Amino acid sequence: PRLGRFSRDGSPNAIAGRKRPLHTIIPAFLEKDQVRIAFGIMGGWNQAQAHAQFVSHIVDFGQNIQAAMETARFTKRTFTGCDVELENRVAGNVRAELEAKGHKLTMRIGFSDDFGGGQAVMRDYAAGVNYGASDPRKDGAAVPELVIKEWGK
């Protein structure tokens, strides 16, 4: 429901004057040199975490936007505790390391829509190429189109 994301007293997200609720309507943009990426990943509580994971897979690991969208995800659904939900595609050694650090893991089947779903578009101005990515966790598709010559060029 609208305005349903406030929490009761005692919570960091409790309703109060001059406050705004934690909310996850967050389209995002990345830019470096001649490359622009616009993306969004829906998924409620998981949305900001999925955004950060998507960006990390591009920036830190050099993945293309489709690979970054498909990479196994994890989420922390609460402010407290050590519970972490993971897609079962997360490598076994990573799961073992998390458990050794005291995390309580809940496994979800691969490409679970519990971890949101998103789309991304990328424009490489230097190459004159557009790219698209669609998350297999939801219904959607990245459909290729001809690049239209930019105005004035």
Locations of regions flagged by a protein language model:
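Proteins synthesized as precursors that undergo proteolytic processing into mature forms
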Residues: 1-112
